[in-house]
Amino acid sequence: MPRYAAFLRGVMPTNCKMPALKAAFEAAGFTGVKTVLGSGNVVFDARSSSEAVLQQQAEAAMQDQLGQAFLTIVRPIEQLRKLLASDPYKPFNVRPTAKRIVTFLRGQPKAKIKLPIELDGARILAMKGGEIFSAYLPNPKGPVFMTLIQKTFGKDLTTRTWDTVAKVAR
């Protein structure tokens, strides 16, 4: 049975407890469910299906079990491992102190976007399929990279650090 990762937008320890989230995914019929960190990352086994169907199942179960649904983006674990092995940051001069982030899109962008784009030290470097690769230097203004990403791609997305994606893919 294939293994998948679900990345949920807007989940944090203050608005969703991980045991309840795990139970919601189990109620959706998924097996081998495990949460990773406290930020809405869920790994699970499911019969082979489209990402869209799995997303709908997870969101319906969260609505039923938790009383709210979080935007859910599903990727096969094998796809995440290939993404990590490809090191999409390698062609770019990313400072060692920069945070590397991956943004997962729910669908394809509506317009063709010329990359790289930069704003206040945040750079959107590349896009491959439904993933966007960015880097930023921590800034007193807060997460300016999210302003740039949402302005460019909308809000049907969620972002994780490169390190978090690696933990989820293990």
PLM features: what roles do these ranges have?
Residues 1-39, 43-170:
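Surface-exposed, charge/polar-rich loops and edge strands
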